[in-house]
Amino acid sequence: MKPLNIIFAGTPDFAARHLQALINSHHNVIAVYTQPDRPAGRGKKLTASPVKELAVSHDIPVYQPGSLRKEPAQQELAALNADIMVVVAYGLILPKVVLDTPRLGCINVHGSILPRWRGAAPIQRALWAGDKETGVTIMQMDVGLDTGDMLLKTYLPIEDDDTSATLYEKLALQGPDALLQALEGLANGTLTAEKQDEVLANYAEKLSKEEARLDWRKSATQLWQEVRAFNPWPVSYFEHQGNTIKVWQTQVSTTSSNAAPGTIISASKKGIEVATGDGVLTLLSMQLPGKKPLSVADILNARGDWFTPNTRLNNEAQ
């Protein structure tokens, strides 16, 4: 297969994994587009994206326009004369003129099995909804939000102990292989584009800190899914004794209870069992204010008086 001249557009670590795969391949990455440097850390020092750092280390030209809607930026991109543009978590909208500029257009790596979970948080929403599988879709981009024709899909079962952190890692390994496979198919003309079924489409909205507040009136299963979805950010939490307590790991208990939602049923080193709107949730790992995440056994050693049976966990803001 003849090497393709590729423009890569991406910003976070997830994107950098894909850029590394392209650098390691026989293709030519002729330019990298990434978000402008942003203030980060306590000192608010201007910080380059992981994609920029990788590109600079390999002497690949880097472009950081604040927008691609203006003609000078579009002309600059067109002058690169790329065969294709690969977009992974870039963060800027590509207008139609940009999508149509490369010979083979622009393709995107998306962390879900489209058309399910279009949008910003597909990994988290798959867990939140209790999906049994996820995957990666390589898509020919159009002007819609993740609405383009699908070129290739890979599938990944979601395990009971998966969190957004673990799924992110798994998809960051799966995505680059899928991307290289799709590029080969595009170059050889062997890929058949598949339209997305709009009836099956749904939208993966961004997560919010407010959404991570545990509502004990929900079912134990739904809360278990949310805790996994919101790990590592924004992290599920509840209010108790005037403190915000983060919850990192739970499981659905086989215990049954008619107690009011939020009531502690039992507390031992094996876990703190809490009544919910349907079923009982066992808290396994939590984080007290200013402390590191700890097992429930360690939490009870430090603050066992907060978690005695029949105590009602208060989830109202103090």
Curated annotation (Swiss-Prot):
Q: What molecular functions are annotated in GO for this chain?
A: methionyl-tRNA formyltransferase activity
Chain residues that bind (6S)-5,6,7,8-tetrahydrofolate: S112, I113, L114, P115
* Higher taxonomy: Bacteria, Pseudomonadati, Pseudomonadota, Gammaproteobacteria, Alteromonadales
Give the matching InterPro entries: Fmt, Formyl_trans_C, Formyl_trans_C_sf, Formyl_transf_N, Formyl_transf_N_sf, Formyl_transferase-like_C_sf, GART_AS, Met-tRNA-FMT_C
Q: What are the EC numbers?
A: 2.1.2.9
Q: What does this protein do?
A: Attaches a formyl group to the free amino group of methionyl-tRNA(fMet). The formyl group appears to play a dual role in the initiator identity of N-formylmethionyl-tRNA by promoting its recognition by IF2 and preventing the misappropriation of this tRNA by the elongation apparatus.
- List the CDD domains hit by this protein, alphabetically: FMT_core_Met-tRNA-FMT_N, Met_tRNA_FMT_C
Catalytic class of the enzyme: transferase
Entry's family note: Belongs to the Fmt family.
- Keywords, in A-Z order: Protein biosynthesis, Transferase
Q: What is this protein called?
A: Methionyl-tRNA formyltransferase
Q: Mind telling me which SUPFAM superfamilies this protein's record contains?
A: FMT C-terminal domain-like (SSF50486), Formyltransferase (SSF53328)
Q: What Pfam families does this protein's entry cite?
A: Formyl_trans_C, Formyl_trans_N
Under catalytic activity, the entry for this protein gives: L-methionyl-tRNA(fMet) + (6R)-10-formyltetrahydrofolate = N-formyl-L-methionyl-tRNA(fMet) + (6S)-5,6,7,8-tetrahydrofolate + H(+)
- Gene Ontology CC entries for this record: cytosol
The family database entries (HAMAP family) matched by this protein are listed as: Formyl_trans (MF_00182)
